UniProtKB/Swiss-Prot annotation:
Position of sequence motif GXSXG: 1266-1270
Lumenal side: 96-117
Enzyme Commission identifier(s): 3.1.1.5
Name this polypeptide is given: Lysophospholipase nte1
Membrane spanning residue stretches: 75-95, 118-138
Gene Ontology annotations of biological process type: phosphatidylcholine catabolic process; regulation of phospholipid biosynthetic process
Compartments, as annotated in UniProt: Endoplasmic reticulum membrane
Source organism superkingdom: Eukaryota
GO CC annotations, alphabetized: endoplasmic reticulum membrane
Membrane topology, record value: Multi-pass membrane protein
Family: Belongs to the NTE family.
Family matches, as PANTHER family: NEUROPATHY TARGET ESTERASE SWS (PTHR14226:SF29), NEUROPATHY TARGET ESTERASE/SWISS CHEESE D.MELANOGASTER (PTHR14226)
Chain ranges for the short sequence motif GXGXXG as given in the UniProt record: 1239-1244
Length: 1538
């Protein structure tokens, strides 16, 4: 084998050697035969040579097999072979491919020659295909980006959830129900301290009445309430044999239902007044007042003897039998002697059973073991010359319909309460007087039209208050006083004089004195008196009526007083006489304080007649209000007698009061006092210092002397306006005051005078003299200008005159009522003025003033008002409680005293539609009561609400005796029905018809409370609340605005304000504030779980959720708490922006998860810190301190640099009334200014000029609505609230629309429309981009016509370009736009000027700009048939006298706009609508090329129209507020420099 195959063997060896690296260890099974190798050796050799070459050129060599780890040398060999064999092979392959293989391929490719031969047609087709492909890509992939925006459908209006009514009437059985009914009945007394509550209820008794049993309430001597059962109250239809009704009344009653007319004993006819159910009182408010005031004298002229006897026995025996008492003495009566002899036992027996009372009604007060009724006691009541007063319940009978349980608090409990707790009594009387005004007087005057009965009380009150000046203050002294005003009158102009000239008061600055300091002095003096075992009131009467020389008490006075008391009675009586300027007329009242220390430094030649006038006026006022020296002397004597005769009882009371009150955490605090020092006082100290007012420390008279102002008013000046709070008391020195009412107010405002009187300056805490010129200042600021212009010229009706010596404003000032009349200076008049705050201090320290007023009111009350007061029920309902359900029987009319109600209609499909909301002073339910139909809707309370329930039985009774009441209520119903006809509600029944929304006109009118709630912690709600309050002040809210936070509440009510018992006091305090101010802001500045946050939610008519726009839109913790409260109040979202810009889509992120936002949203620009400092500072480390310091420095630098780097905002308010907070304030007040823009094609360019004219005139625009081109222009302005970007974008869009090439390129086969709509879409999309309506700075909407569902739709959310495009879609020219399966077209087909919808959103004044075309109304007479050929010839015949008949397209267009014409005429006659139509008739619908010309036409017309309104005085400018401030009362009167 070796010899034969030498060459083959050599080649095989070489092959083996070359393959050896690849196969280091060949398999032993691989065997080859010699023959096979010999036959294929050349082929194999050639193949292997090629393979080796190719592998060397393309494939890198494989890696070396790993060496055997037997020795270290193997490892080194493997690494050596890898570096020196594999790597060079790879480099060789890369270099070979780059330098040889790749160039060879390229050379071969480029050396080839290809030849294509095509004709022109082929080239043209190819070019056309390329162009078509590119145009398709640009058209459908680039230019129609608007069609690929993410789906953002309109936001659905939230549905209202009526939470289940858990406050059903008889839900609690047993004792709990009994207690609840009793507590609900005594709520009329307001907040009761624990000892006061025990004092009232410890003698309470219960009585069972069987069905059919009658009770004569005119003989009942106590407070009666129904605990369980049903009682009907009847009144006699005749009195003293004289019918009070016409002859037909009995026949009317006989024909009516059995419940309206009853006969008792077959003699007298009775009429049903009301039905009293569980938890209601059988006593009226006047009867409660009579229980407190039966021992009070009516006038100061009755003398000290009679007055002394009137109170003495009451305090002696603690039981008086004079209900309703004669104010004359009973000292010699056997009963008085009996009570003196028996002491405490008689008091307890009489208090517990009340059997010593005269004229005991035939009531069996249950089982008792008291002494039998003694007949001789009532007989001495009839003394000669003394007439017994009639009952306050004349001719009133109660009858039990079922077995009934009643509770009776006897009159003795009220008398004892008056004596032991005089300040608490005064507080209760104040509450009852307030509710008397809110319930009875307001209902009778404003609702029933009983002006004569209500105003007659004030007229008759003058006989009690008239007090003449001393003789020495008349004649020459009065002439000298008048001479002091002459120079000032000559110096000032008529406009300044009519405001009033006040005499200079040098000591006016000393009026304000810390009430807390006076309280501490009073408590200290009371403790000193208690330690010395002497009564506080041992001084002489001159000590009370006298006046110390100093301007106010001081600590030095306390020391001097104590020293005088130590010297003995002689000096004790001498000091007041020496220190009283009334006893020594030559005393200069305003000496220096150093002279006051000695009573002997007086100069007779330093007589100050001004001070004497002030003191004389003060004496007359104090006598007029019942605060006389004899009264106080009597109270002082009564307190001595009580202490001397029954010292055991006095000590028991003092111990009991002190023990109970010390343990009681809720000290008595006056609701109008901001000091919390009263919590440290005891009941005894208050009773001793306030009953007689005898503390020489708290010498109120010294303070009041400096509060008296002497003011001159020329003839015609208005001192008090109807509907406002009395600024104080006016004492007429010389001249006459005319008291009257505007004639038109009787018919204009039938519902309580609570309708806002805008433009009045806010009421200050100390409202000094405020003057007006005429009654024209009653005009509202931006309410309907036409109605207010008419009101200016209406006359007034004079009621009576106030002569010299008379007092005006007594009832209103002491009881904090609003004035029912105007008070005008009949002649030049000189008056003394005492502010209302001074009267409040008098009432606080001397409860006798309130009790005297209550006594006088009960004595002057007409019988009609008494019956109305008896039948009216004061009802308190909780938030969410349903008052009546849909379909219930209508049994009463409800008048809202405080709170807010909502009426909702429950549909068959479960949807809830808001019918209306009712605020303070409004009524609901008259139509159902008069028609005796069922309730058409469900009425529930949005928050805690006080109502006056006017039962149908009372209405029927009054209708028979007083038909004028029926006429008055009929006028009210007729006015409401007319409003429903003239201002229809927005269309219902669709997805976009605001079903369930509370965003209606009724929901923004008469808002009284607004809660400001943050979304999450860190939102600056306090600063936001203050800015909003300032804006509300500037726009002029009636009666002013106040804001409350937790600190303010704690300052007023103490730290226990939010406790279980303190909530009663808190609710009453908040109700008083809401009645006092026009709007109250509740700022939730505490943590989320605090009671104050809960109070802010429950007390709010509207809740503003304030969030930072740049922060996370997730649900905050305050919102979760709000949802847990289940409140039904209107909720609005307020987004705070650092800059006046809202990124597209931001608002949708906030609203997406907040379906409970049912009142809209607002964008507000307000500077704030995005990273507020933490409220709870953490432990400060060195690194944290440095980091915090750096952050502070960085924030300070950014404050001065970052805002300058940014571009200036697009809009800056030129007037302060165009700010965001003013816009929100007008929205809350229902005084928003709306702008409605109509459609008309290119004629709508004139609207740009009108808007510019409005902005230059300073008129703010709050809501914008538009149709067709009006929707486009309105959206441009609402987006930035500035005319500059609006003008630029509108002109750019007009340029695109003026290009005919764009429309020619957009033409298509006219199956649906002539164009595809793409160019139109592009023009609108290039203007608005992807912005959404929610992101607009101003509230905006546009309307469209849904031809799929044949209804109009209003869009206020979603992409702007889509709904603006839909609102501008003319049928036939542009295809309808599809929205959720519906086809939308131009909104002008149904309503081209959407004034009605704008009015429904709450806009008060609406500027409506109409640019539509005018239809050709030429009469046609072509006959009954018409030839088309004749029509064509007639059009071309210039001599034809026949008008051209309309074409087919014209007929279709007119047919499409039929309903729009009717809505346009209705819009022109809408109250508050200012209709504007620029002269744009010569311009066509598509003449967008004349932009500048049409713009100038609109601008010139707008300026001319607004100037015309300004000259007529009907322009609703905010600047008018400044002018009205000149006409109305100034903040402080101009003082004469005399």
């Amino acid at each position: 084998m070796a010899t034969d195959g030498g060459p083959l063997a050599a080649s095989s060896a070489s092959l083996d050697s070359s393959l050896s690296p690849l196969h280091a260890s060949p398999s032993p099974s691989s065997t080859y035969t010699a023959s096979s190798l010999a036959l294929s050796a050349p082929a194999i050799a050639a193949s292997f040579s090629v393979a080796s070459t190719f592998s060397n050129s393309l494939i890198p060599p494989p890696p070396l097999p790993p060496p055997t780890p037997s020795t270290m040398a193997g490892w080194f060999g493997w690494v050596f072979s890898f570096f020196f064999q594999v790597i060079p092979s790879v480099l060789y392959w890369v270099i070979t491919f780059a330098t040889i293989t790749l160039p060879t391929w390229l050379f071969t490719l480029f050396s080839m020659s290809l030849t294509f031969t095509m004709n022109f047609t082929t080239l043209l087709l190819i070019a056309l295909a390329i162009v078509s492909t590119i145009s398709w890509f640009i058209r459908y992939r680039f230019l129609n980006m608007y069609s690929r925006l993410p789906s953002e459908p309109q936001r659905k209006e939230p549905h209202l959830d009526l939470f289940p009514d858990v406050q059903e009437g008889d839900s609690k059985p047993g004792l709990a129900n009994y207690l609840d009914e009793f507590l609900s009945a005594i709520k009329v007394f307001g907040y009761l301290e624990r000892p006061v509550f025990h004092e009232l209820t410890r003698t309470m008794q219960t009585r069972k009445l069987i069905a059919g049993e009658t009770l004569m309430l005119e003989e009942e001597k106590g407070f009666c309430l129904v605990v369980d059962g049903l009682v009907q109250i009847f009144v006699k239809s005749m009195r003293d044999g004289k019918p009070n009704v016409d002859e037909g009344s009995n026949h009317m009653g006989a024909e009516s239902s059995d419940e309206d007319d009853h006969r008792v004993d077959g003699k007298q006819g009775y009429q049903l007044l009301t039905e009293v159910k569980n938890g209601a009182s059988m006593s009226s408010l006047f009867s409660i007042l009579s229980l407190f005031t039966e021992d009070i004298q009516l006038r100061a002229s009755e003398g000290s003897s009679s007055s002394a006897s009137s109170v003495g026995p009451s305090t002696n025996a603690r039981v008086s039998d004079s209900f309703p008492a004669s104010p004359h003495g009973l000292e010699d009566s056997p009963r008085s002697n009996f009570v003196r002899d028996h002491g405490d036992s008689v008091a307890h027996i009489s208090n517990s059973n009340g059997e010593l009372l005269p004229s005991v009604p035939p009531l069996n007060l249950g089982e008792s073991h008291a002494m039998p009724i003694q007949e001789p006691y009532p007989k001495p009541r009839s003394q000669p010359g003394k007439r017994r007063r009639k009952s306050v319940h004349p001719d009133i009978v109660a009858r039990a319909m079922v077995d009934t349980t009643i509770a009776i608090i006897p009159a003795s409990a009220f008398r004892r309460l008056t004596r032991v707790y005089p300040r608490a009594t005064a507080h209760i009387v104040q509450v009852i007087l307030t509710r008397l005004q809110r319930v009875t007087f307001a209902t009778a005057h404003s609702y029933l039209g009983l002006n004569n009965d209500v105003l007659g009380i004030e007229k008759q009150m003058t006989k009690f208050t008239t007090q003449d000046l001393p003789n020495e203050m008349r004649g020459a002294a009065l002439d000298r006083l008048k001479d002091k005003f002459i120079k000032e009158r000559d110096r000032l102009g008529p406009e300044e004089i009519i405001k009033g000239i006040a005499l200079h008061n040098p000591f006016a600055g000393r009026r304000r004195r810390s009430s807390s300091f006076l309280r501490k002095e009073a408590v200290l003096h009371a403790k000193m008196a208690a330690q010395s075992k002497r009564p506080v009131s041992m001084a002489s009467p001159e000590d009370i009526s006298g006046d110390r020389e100093s301007a106010g008490p001081s600590p030095g006075d306390l020391l001097s007083t104590i020293q005088l008391s130590r010297f003995g009675p002689r000096y004790e009586h001498l000091a007041p006489k020496l220190l009283s300027p009334l006893t020594d007329k030559e005393n200069p009242p305003f000496m220096a304080p150093v002279m006051h220390s000695s009573p002997f430094h007086r100069k007779k030649d330093a007589v100050d007649e001004d001070a004497l006038f002030r003191e004389s006026i003060l004496d007359c006022i104090m006598n007029g209000i019942g605060l006389t020296s004899s009264t106080r002397d009597v109270l002082r004597k009564s307190s001595h007698t009580s202490g001397d005769i029954s010292p055991k009882l006095l000590s028991y009371d003092s111990r009991r009061q002190k023990a109970v009150f010390t343990n009681n955490a809720f000290g008595f605090i006056d609701p109008y006092d901001s000091s919390a020092d009263g919590e440290t006082e005891s009941m005894m100290s208050m009773s001793m210092t306030s009953a007689g007012g005898t503390s020489p420390i708290v010498n109120l008279r010294e303070e009041l002397r400096n509060d008296i102002e002497i003011v001159y008013f020329p003839q015609g000046s208005v001192l008090v306006e109807q509907g406002e709070r009395h600024p104080g008391l006016y004492y007429v020195i010389d001249g006459f005051l005319d008291v009257g009412i505007p004639v038109s107010d009787k018919g204009e405002d039938l519902v309580g005078g609570s309708r806002p009187v805008y433009g009045q300056p806010p009421e200050e805490f100390f409202p000094t003299l405020k003057r007006t010129t005429t009654s024209s200042s009653r005009v509202s600021g931006v309410t309907s200008a036409t109605n207010d212009t008419k009101r200016k010229r209406q006359s007034r009706k004079s009621l009576y005159l106030i002569k010299p010596g008379g007092i005006q404003g007594y009832v209103g000032s002491v009881a904090s009522y609003r004035s029912y009349t105007d008070v005008v200076a009949k002649t030049d008049v000189y008056v003394g003025f005492l502010p209302r705050s001074s009267l409040e201090r008098i009432a606080e320290r001397y409860p006798i003033a309130l009790l005297t007023l209550a006594k006088r009111l009960t004595s002057l009350l007409p019988r009609l008002l008494l019956h109305i007061d008896f039948a009216l029920e004061w009802v308190q309902v909780s938030a969410g409680q349903v008052i009546y359900h849909q379909g219930d029987e209508s049994d009463a009319i409800y008048l809202v005293l405080n709170g807010r109600l909502r009426s909702v209609l429950e549909g068959t499909d479960g949807k809830i539609t808001v019918v209306g909301e009712y605020g303070q002073g409004e009524s609901v339910g008259e139509l159902e009561v008069m028609t005796e139909s069922t309730r058409p809707a469900t009425l529930h309370a949005i928050r805690d609400t006080e109502l006056a329930k006017f039962p149908r039985s009372l209405f029927n009774s009054l209708a028979q005796e007083h038909p004028g009441i029926t006429i008055q209520v009929s006028k009210l119903i007729a006015q409401r029905m007319r409003d429903l006809v003239e201002l229809p509600m927005p269309e219902k029944g669709g997805e976009h018809a605001n079903v369930g929304s509370v965003k209606t006109a009724a929901s923004v009118v008469n808002l009284r409370t607004v809660g400001i709630l943050p979304v999450t912690a860190g939102v600056p709600v306090v600063e936001f609340g203050h800015r909003l309050q300032n804006a509300l002040h500037q726009i002029g809210v009636t009666n002013g605005v106040t804001s409350l936070n937790q600190a303010a509440i704690l300052n007023h009510l103490g730290r226990h304000a939010f406790s279980k018992m303190g909530k009663l006091k808190l609710s009453q305090y908040l109700a008083d504030l809401e009645e006092k101010y026009g709007m109250v802001l509740y700022i939730a500045d505490t943590n989320v779980n605090s009671p104050w946050t809960q109070t802010c939610i429950t007390q709010a008519d509207c809740i503003l959720l304030v969030g930072l726009a740049e922060s996370s839109p997730s649900i905050g913790e305050y919102e979760r708490f709000l949802l847990g409260m289940k409140t039904t109040a209107r909720k609005e979202l307020v987004l705070l922006h650092s800059e006046r810009y809202c990124p597209p889509g931001l608002t949708r992120q906030w609203l997406k998860n907040r379906m409970w936002i049912n009142g809209g949203h607002h964008h507000i620009q307000m500077g704030f810190r995005l990273t507020p400092e933490p409220s709870h500072p953490q432990a400060k480390r060195l690194g944290a301190v440095l980091k915090q310091r750096v952050q502070v420095i960085q924030a300070e630098i950014q404050k001065y640099t970052s805002r300058r780097i940014r571009q200036t905002p697009l809009y800056s308010a030129q007037t302060p009334f165009k700010g965001d907070f003013h816009r929100l304030a007008r929205r809350l007040c229902g005084r928003s200014v709306g702008l409605v823009l109509g459609g008309g094609g290119a004629r709508g360019i004139a609207q740009v000029g009108v808007i510019k004219a409005l902005e230059e005139a300073g008129i703010p625009i709050d809501i914008i609505g538009g149709t067709s081109i009006g929707s486009f222009i309105g959206a441009l302005y609402a987006r930035d609230a500035d005319v500059v970007p609006m003008y630029g974008r509108a002109k750019k869009f007009a340029g695109r629309m003026a290009s005919m090439w764009r429309f020619m390129l957009d033409l298509t086969y006219p199956t649906t429309s002539y164009t595809t709509g793409h160019e139109f879409n592009r023009g609108i999309f290039k203007t608005f981009g992807d912005s959404q309506i929610e992101d607009f700075w101003l509230e905006y909407y546009c309307n469209t016509t849904n031809i799929s569902k044949s209804r109009p739709e209003f869009h206020s959310s979603g992409y702007t370009w889509r709904y603006v495009r839909a609102s501008m879609s003319l049928a036939g020219l542009i295809p309808p736009i599809c929205d959720e399966g519906s086809m939308l077209l131009d909104g002008g087909y149904i309503d081209n000027l959407t004034v009605t919808h704008m009015k429904g959103l709450g806009a008060d004044v609406i500027f409506a700009v109409d640019v539509g075309s005018i239809d050709d109304n030429t009469p046609q007479g072509y006959g009954d048939s018409l030839s088309g050929f004749w029509t064509v010839l007639n059009r071309w015949n210039p001599f034809s006298a026949c008008p051209n008949p309309p074409t087919l397209s014209e007929i279709q267009a007119r047919l499409a706009y039929v309903s729009s014409i009717d809505n346009l005429e209705r819009a022109k006659n809408t109250p508050g609508c200012l209709y504007m139509r620029p002269p744009i008739d010569p311009y066509g619908t598509l003449e967008f090329g004349k932009f500048d010309e049409i713009y100038q036409v609109g601008y010139a017309y707008g300026k001319q129209y607004l100037e015309k309104l300004r000259s007529e005085g009907s322009l609703p400018l905010p600047e008018e507020t400044e002018e009205k401030k000149k006409l109305q009362r100034t903040l402080a009167p101009r003082r004469a420099s005399i």
